[in-house]
Curated annotation (Swiss-Prot):
Domain of life of the native organism: Bacteria
Gene3D superfamilies per record: 3.30.1320.10
Annotated spans, Disordered: 153-192
UniProt name for this protein: Small ribosomal subunit protein bS16
Organism expressing this protein natively: Porphyromonas gingivalis (strain ATCC BAA-308 / W83)
GO CC, alphabetical: cytoplasm; small ribosomal subunit
Keyword Ribosomal protein: yes
Protein family (similarity comment): Belongs to the bacterial ribosomal protein bS16 family.
GO-annotated molecular function: structural constituent of ribosome
BP term (GO), one: translation
Length: 192
């Protein structure tokens, strides 16, 4: 039976994640499969891969053909590298211990690179958040200054209005006794 290692789609529209399965090459994409050997979530940064290494190595060893994306995943996880090293052991180029040492060194380099990438992504996110926070602080400060200016202008206008009203009252009180005195004087003259 011709077997393939491929991805089986799950999830909702626009947010897919995949199961890594071994299936008959004639089976439909999301149909019957022989064995599930892992999962792949491309929605995270970096993509999350959970893979049963031993079973993937077994299926590659018995001739299962991975699809392009599955091949990239297996390569990233080191399954294809281990298959290559086991081929060298079979040919007698080196022994099993040397193959294990080479694989561990290769895997350590890959994990270091992945951790560096995660750190860079995290640093970029922190820097982006800092820039956004500074921009938001500047906008809030400008808004606060505008509100303070507006309140100061309103207070000044209110003070001026109160001063004008007080001046008008003072003028009215001054005018009222003069008018009253002026009214009394003609009344006194007319009485004579």
């Amino acid at each position: 039976m011709a077997t393939k290692i491929r991805l089986q789609r799950h999830g909702r529209k626009g947010y897919a994640f995949y199961k890594i399965v071994v299936a008959d090459s004639r089976a439909p994409r999301d149909g019957k499969f022989i064995e599930r050997i892992g999962s792949y979530n491309p929605n995270t940064n970096p993509a999350t891969i959970d893979l049963n290494f031993e079973r993937a190595l077994y299926w590659i060893g018995v001739g299962a053909q991975p699809t392009d994306t599955a091949r990239n995943i297996l390569s990233r996880e080191g399954v294809l590298m281990m298959k290559h090293l086991l081929g060298g052991v079979k040919k007698g180029a080196f022994d099993q211990a040397a193959a294990e040492n080479k694989f561990e060194a290769w895997l350590k380099g890959k994990k270091d690179a992945l951790n560096n990438m995660k750190a860079k992504v995290k640093e970029a996110a922190v820097a982006d958040d800092k820039v956004k926070l500074e921009a938001e602080k500047a906008v809030n400060k400008a808004r606060a200054e505008a509100v303070a200016e507006k309140k100061a202008a309103e207070a000044k206008a209110k003070a001026e209005a109160e001063a004008a009203a007080a001046a008008e009252e003072a003028a009215e009180t001054e005018e009222t006794p003069v008018e009253a005195a002026a009214e009394e004087a003609p009344a006194a003259e007319s009485a004579e």
